[in-house]
Amino acid sequence: MGKIIGIDLGTTNSCVAIIDGTQVKVLENSEGDRTTPSIIAYTQDGEILVGQPAKRQAVTNPQNTLFAIKRLIGRRFKDEEVQRDSNIMPYKIVAADNGDAWLEVKDQKMAPPQISAEVLKKMKKTAEDYLGETITEAVITVPAYFNDAQRQATKDAGRIAGLEVKRIINEPTAAALAYGLDKEVGNRTIAVYDLGGGTFDISIIEIDEVDGEKTFEVLATNGDTHLGGEDFDNRMINYLVDEFKKEQGFDLRNDPLAMQRLKEAAEKAKIELSSAQQTDVNLPYITADATGPKHLNIKVTRAKLESLVEELVNRSLEPLKVALQDAGLSVSEIQDVILVGGQTRMPLVQKKVADFFGKEPRKDVNPDEAVAIGAAVQGGVLSGDVKDVLLLDVSPLSLGIETMGGVMTALIAKNTTIPTKHSQVFSTAEDNQSAVTIHVLQGERKRAHDNKSLGQFNLDGIQAAPRGMPQIEVTFDIDADGILHVSAKDKNSGREQKITIKASSGLNEEEIQKMVRDAEANAEADRKFEELVQARNQGDHLLHSTRKQLEEVGDKLAADDKTAIDDALKALESALKGEDKAEIEAKIQALVQVSGKLLEASQPQPGAEGAADDASARRDDDVVDAEFEEVKDKK
């Protein structure tokens, strides 16, 4: 079995780690960074940029630069959270034919898993460059509070990126693995508070060690899949926009370029205010009107930022209470608090969490890397590289079906350890009913339509009988990824119907296969583009060095030779403006051939100085050819 890499596919940043011998190693990407911005850009010339290169050009290409895609994955367009994001994002969120939230880039509709796959491909390539081998398997993390549709969509993204997703694990659980594996912690109960770029989770986890085997058992989990650093940024952006409007009478919300600059500045200011008491947001030439250019210069204090976001931080505390209650624990029974996610660097967040638990959170876990490290550990467990670790995760939400009167009847309660299987017998509501519809739901509300609909299917061919007589056994089976399989069986006839729940939304197999093919085609296009760039660089270098030599010794060349070199230079220069690699390489070869005369002209010429011929000839024996470098006098 090859390496199974661990990927933290984050809202704001992503990270990849591997088991390297006995150690877990977080890998640096091609830019030399250990985390990669989860930003994807589609340029005018058809190139796809991922990470820092995408982030750098965001200001000039806001409509085609996509970020925070994780907030849309597995969601419906009409969802309240999606509608809220749709009003503030510079890119276009649209409804797919099946009602999912998709994105529109350059007049083309794209699914969130298809876009997230570009980030996963970069993570895959980072690991392949480090290991020198092809990677096909991964463990990918998701927020603990992700529902079935969001988990399925994440697996789809992995497939599109060319990865077999061996396991989906919850981010707080992964962080607990990273924390607990390399420490002699003994038996402990910990709380993992995970506030990332777009999602929030809290998990209560018990770590037990028996005869050298560590068991990580999740007792309870809770959270909010639409609360994170992006929301903190948006509070700051709205404040800056409102202040600018007060001063200048101009609403920047109508200017996508200005909003993109403002987003970057707001995020930077938020980060600075974690260590400083105040900062200046200074954006010259933010916009212009008939009276001339407008400049934005606003001073923001830490106290001001905290007043803007305090309600968001408080929102994260309610799930803490519910998780503790579900685990049957009091605050005093939590021995360690682990902070995960970049937003937990904010002093206000740290203070509120410390006040809630009555103890300071641990500072020895890297909030940006812990989740990827835990994913790599789980990959090591699956491949056999890591021994004596058992992970017992839970289903975050109750699962059930709609029964008579529009009631949700739960078959599997929230915080049930997975994998798990549960069956229950139901019956018909009408006399001689020949079919039943099994409507699968996820959530905690009593009314069926208040919960998340995961899909429905029919069991027909039920033998005619008075209502309440037929016995229909419904079985829910959750696998280790937290993905649900449902079957319904008529116990009288033995007739059975099974489905793996693909939410009524989601990508179908044909769409996934098409996206996989597109991704493979893109990989080939990327390779060709890289080769074209290499040829261009080689051509540019040759142009520069040949011109330099021509300046130095061109006067020693015959007129015909000089003309031939000039023509070859022009031909190469013209080829470099095109997209044809073969043409560029041919013109490089042509220039190399004709510029041989330049090389000859730059060598010492015996017999060229008339009277000094004999002396030159005698000295020639002692001459050693050497490379030289022109040193220009400093002025």
Swiss-Prot record:
<feature type="modified residue" description="Phosphothreonine; by autocatalysis">
    <location>
        <position position="199"/>
    </location>
</feature>
<comment type="function">
    <text>Acts as a chaperone.</text>
</comment>
<keyword id="KW-0067">ATP-binding</keyword>
<protein>
    <recommendedName>
        <fullName>Chaperone protein DnaK</fullName>
    </recommendedName>
</protein>
<dbReference type="InterPro" id="IPR043129">
    <property type="entry name" value="ATPase_NBD"/>
</dbReference>
<dbReference type="Pfam" id="PF00012">
    <property type="entry name" value="HSP70"/>
</dbReference>
<keyword id="KW-0346">Stress response</keyword>
<dbReference type="GO" id="GO:0140662">
    <property type="term" value="F:ATP-dependent protein folding chaperone"/>
</dbReference>
<feature type="region of interest" description="Disordered">
    <location>
        <begin position="600"/>
        <end position="635"/>
    </location>
</feature>
<keyword id="KW-0547">Nucleotide-binding</keyword>
<dbReference type="GO" id="GO:0051082">
    <property type="term" value="F:unfolded protein binding"/>
</dbReference>
<dbReference type="InterPro" id="IPR013126">
    <property type="entry name" value="Hsp_70_fam"/>
</dbReference>
<dbReference type="GO" id="GO:0005524">
    <property type="term" value="F:ATP binding"/>
</dbReference>
<dbReference type="InterPro" id="IPR029047">
    <property type="entry name" value="HSP70_peptide-bd_sf"/>
</dbReference>
<keyword id="KW-0597">Phosphoprotein</keyword>
<comment type="similarity">
    <text>Belongs to the heat shock protein 70 family.</text>
</comment>
<keyword id="KW-0143">Chaperone</keyword>
<dbReference type="InterPro" id="IPR012725">
    <property type="entry name" value="Chaperone_DnaK"/>
</dbReference>
<dbReference type="InterPro" id="IPR029048">
    <property type="entry name" value="HSP70_C_sf"/>
</dbReference>
<dbReference type="InterPro" id="IPR018181">
    <property type="entry name" value="Heat_shock_70_CS"/>
</dbReference>
